From Swiss-Prot:
Keywords: Biotin biosynthesis, Pyridoxal phosphate, Transferase. The gene is bioF. One of its GO terms (biological process) is biotin biosynthetic process. The modification N6-(pyridoxal phosphate)lysine is found at residue 237. Pfam families: Aminotran_1_2. This is 8-amino-7-oxononanoate synthase. It is an enzyme of class 2 (transferase). It comes from Geotalea uraniireducens (strain Rf4). Pathway: Cofactor biosynthesis; biotin biosynthesis. Homodimer. Pyridoxal 5'-phosphate binds at residues 105-106, 178, 206, 234. PANTHER family: 8-AMINO-7-OXONONANOATE SYNTHASE, CLASS II AMINOTRANSFERASE/8-AMINO-7-OXONONANOATE SYNTHASE.
Length: 391
C-alpha cells in the first residue's frame, strides 16, 4: 500500500503539491506576505467590503449585544433574530418568498442538492461546476449527468434521452464559473427547465453583489430572476463576510429546513457574521454599492485589455475573474513564484481544480484596485510571461 509520504512525494514531483500562505493583516488590495507588502490579485473580496467600516461596526455592535457564539444548531436553540433578519433581507434582495443561511458555500451546495434530489431523480450539471455541486450530487444518490460546459444542445439531448418516471429533474449550474470567469447561459437554461418540467438551481457565489444593475447577480443580468427556482450564493466573496444562503419559495426553504443535513447538524452562524452580512447587503443595495460595481467593471476592462494587448489568452472571461492561460503545472507555479518576487500575489491553478493542460493564473480584481495597481500587475505578468515563453 502506498504511504502518505509516497503520495506527497508524487504530488511534489508533478507540481501538484499544495500548501498555505500566511497573509498578514486585512483583506484589502495590498497584503503582507513574508514580512513585505504585495499587491493582492487573488482574493474574492471583489468590492473590498471585508475591511469596510460599516461591516466592522455592525459586527462589533452584534458581539456587544449578543455575544460571540450562537450556542446551538438552528433547530435547537441557535436561531436568533439576526438570522431571521438576514434571511428576510436576502429573500427581498433575490426576489423570493424565503431564504435560509448556511455555514459555507460548500455546506450550502452539498446540503441543498442532496436534500432536493435522491434516488429516482436526475441531476444535470455543467462539467465546470464547482466541486461542492459535484459532491452534493454524489451524496444525493440521484443519477448524475454532466453535460459539456455551456453546451445547451447536448443538455437538451440529455434531457430528452433521460427518463424520469416519477422523480425530479434538477438542472444546476454556476452563474459565474469560478475558474474561467465566464457566465452560464441562463436564459437558455430557463427555457429548457420549463420545457422539461425541471428545477433550476444557480450557484451565484461569484455573481452576487457584482453583476446586474442592482448587484443581484447573474440571473438579474440575464433578466431571469423570477425564473430560477433556487438561488444559491455566498456571503464571503463580494459581500465581504462569511457563510452562504439559499433563496427560494417558502415550500422549498421549509423542505431544506427539514431535509438539508448540512443545515440541520451544524451550529448556526455567529452574531458578528450575521450582522456584518446584513450590513453588506444594505451597502450593496445602495448608491455606494453601485459605485463600487462600476469601479470593478472599469478595472476588469482595463486589466483584460492590457493582458490581451500583449498576447495573453484570458480564456473567454466575462467577469472580474480573469484567468491567464499558461498550460503546464510546473510552469504555472513558476510563473506564480516569480510574480510574488515582483510583489504581485497571484495563485497558480492546477489539477484537480482544472483539467490537465489548462493550468492558469487566476487573477481576481477588486473595486479598490487603482490604475497604478493594475498597471503594476500587467507589467509584471508581461515580463514574466515573456521570460517563460508564455507569450
Amino acid at each position: 500500500m502506498q504511504t502518505f509520504a509516497e503520495e506527497l512525494a508524487a504530488l511534489r514531483m508533478e507540481g501538484l503539491f499544495r500548501s498555505m500562505r500566511l497573509v498578514e493583516g486585512n483583506q484589502s488590495k495590498r497584503a503582507v506576505l513574508d514580512g513585505r507588502e504585495v499587491l493582492l490579485l487573488c482574493s474574492n473580496n471583489y468590492l473590498g467590503l471585508a475591511d469596510h467600516p460599516l461591516l466592522k461596526e455592525a459586527a462589533i455592535r452584534a458581539v456587544e449585544r449578543y455575544g460571540v457564539g450562537s450556542g446551538a444548531s438552528r433547530l435547537v436553540s441557535g436561531t436568533m433574530e439576526l438570522h431571521e433578519a438576514l434571511e428576510a433581507r436576502i429573500a427581498a434582495f433575490k426576489g423570493t418568498n424565503s431564504a435560509l443561511v448556511f455555514n459555507s458555500g460548500y455546506a450550502a451546495n452539498t446540503g441543498i442538492i442532496s436534500a432536493i434530489a435522491g434516488r429516482g431523480d436526475v441531476i444535470f450539471s455543467d462539467r465546470l461546476n464547482h466541486a461542492s455541486i459535484v459532491d452534493g450530487a454524489l451524496l444525493s444518490r440521484a443519477r448524475f449527468v454532466r453535460y459539456p460546459h455551456n453546451n445547451i444542445s447536448v443538455l437538451r439531448r440529455l434531457l430528452e434521452d433521460t427518463e424520469v418516471a416519477s422523480g425530479r429533474r434538477l438542472i444546476v449550474t454556476d452563474g459565474v464559473f469560478s475558474m474561467d470567469g465566464d457566465l452560464a447561459k441562463l436564459s437558455e437554461l430557463v427555457a429548457l427547465k420549463k420545457e422539461f418540467d425541471a428545477l433550476l438551481m444557480v450557484d451565484d457565489a461569484h455573481g452576487t453583489g457584482v453583476l446586474g444593475d442592482g448587484g443581484r447577480g447573474s440571473a438579474e443580468q440575464c433578466g431571469v430572476m423570477a425564473e430560477v427556482d433556487i438561488h444559491m450564493g455566498t456571503l464571503g466573496k463580494a459581500l465581504g463576510s462569511f457563510g452562504a444562503y439559499a433563496a427560494a419559495s417558502r415550500e422549498i426553504i421549509d423542505y431544506l429546513v427539514n431535509r438539508a443535513r448540512s443545515f440541520i447538524f451544524s451550529t448556526s452562524l455567529p452574531p458578528a457574521v450575521l450582522a456584518a452580512s446584513q450590513a453588506a447587503f444594505e451597502l450593496v443595495d445602495s448608491p455606494s454599492g453601485a459605485a463600487l460595481r462600476l469601479a470593478l467593471a472599469a478595472n476588469t476592462i482595463r486589466f483584460k485589455a492590457g493582458l490581451q494587448a500583449v498576447g495573453f489568452d484570458t480564456m473567454g472571461s466575462e467577469t472580474q475573474i480573469v484567468p491567464v492561460y499558461v498550460g503546464g503545472a510546473q510552469q504555472t507555479m513558476e510563473f506564480s513564484r516569480l510574480l510574488l518576487e515582483e510583489g504581485v500575489f497571484v495563485q497558480g491553478i492546477r489539477p484537480p481544480t482544472v483539467p490537465a493542460g489548462s493550468c492558469r493564473l487566476r487573477c481576481t480584481l477588486m473595486a479598490t484596485h487603482s490604475e497604478n495597481d493594475l498597471d503594476q500587475a500587467i507589467t509584471a505578468i508581461t515580463a514574466i510571461g515573456e521570460k517563460l515563453g508564455v507569450i
